[in-house]
Structures are given as structure tokens and as C-alpha cells.
């Protein structure tokens, strides 16, 4: 299992005014990356999910990989991953993303309050977040890493619609300017804290800006390495 975490985090790293009143992280890209209106957003996400096919997956889901571009570009693709959660009941969801806006040293773990979207609040699993932070000095809470970051925010409406009648909490983790051993540090921490009620979401767009055939080649190589547990 530890190899899976290492591969997924390595994959993520290859892509490459304050709003914390009352410990609520306000939406940064509502109305831009996805609809800012509650009803419109719910309808769009529901349509994406309705058009996605659920695969016949054997065994327990440990993690999903999802893109984080605007819904116009990647919403339907993201829905295919989230569709696989149908029938599951994860209580704790760890979401890992790169940092697109804030340069910082370390791995920032958001450990208090809630994230807000037009669909409502998503609570932070503070106990789990602090357990992760306690594992290594590379784990910190750097608020600026999360202030404008879209890569975690855009995944939340899918969770809110998939799990709209269920109680779940999240642990947002954003990677800064990683050192070579950060992949191992995070993988080891995840291995220690995750249980059968925990899902890992890797928010990553894979290849960018390539012609279609080249993008398929690169992304197939990446997914093939994951399937083979090839950490090299």
C-alpha cells in the first residue's frame, strides 16, 4: 500500500484579501472554475455524474486521481473518478494538490475549521490533520498555501453531491517546493494514519498543452507505472 501512496504523490508533483474569518476558507474560484450559483452548480455536477459510467472495480478503493481545471474543460473527466465512489461511505477524505500560487517550503496541512463552496461547508477533520502534522517537521500549516489554491476547492462540489446525505470530513494537503524526500515523508505519514474509512484524492492534471497523441502517450505511461507499482 505504501508504494501506491508513493506513486500517487510522485505523480502529483510532476504536474506542476484573507478569507479565514471564523476558520472558514472562502471559495476562491466560484464563478470562474465552476458556477457560483448553488442550484446551477448542483445541477451541473449532477449532470456530469449522470453521464459518467461506474466501472466494475474489484476490491476496496484506496484512492482516486482527478483533474483540477475549470469544469468546462475537465468536469466530465473528474466525474468519471468520483462516480466510482457510488455506494461507498468514506468518513475521512485526504485531498493532496500542488501549489499553483504560493511558493513555500514544506507540506501544508489545513487543520482547522471548514472549506466553503456555494453548496455549503465541508468540515476539516482536525484530529486527522494534526496527526499528519505530528509525523514530521516538514508538515506545517501555511494559510497562504490554501488561500487562492483551486486544486482542492474544485473537487469539493463533487464530494458534496456524491455524499450529500452522508457525513464526511476532509484533510486538505498542499505541496510547496518539495525536497527529494518529501514524497517518502508524505507516503509514510499516509500509511500510518489511513484506515478503511479513509479515501485519498490526488488532484492533478497530468500532461498539459501537448498535442492529443502525445498527451495520451505520456498519461498512459503514468497510469501504467501506477498499475505496475513502478516507483521509478
Go through each PLM region and give its residues.
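Active-site histidine-anchored catalytic micro-motif
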Residues: 20-232
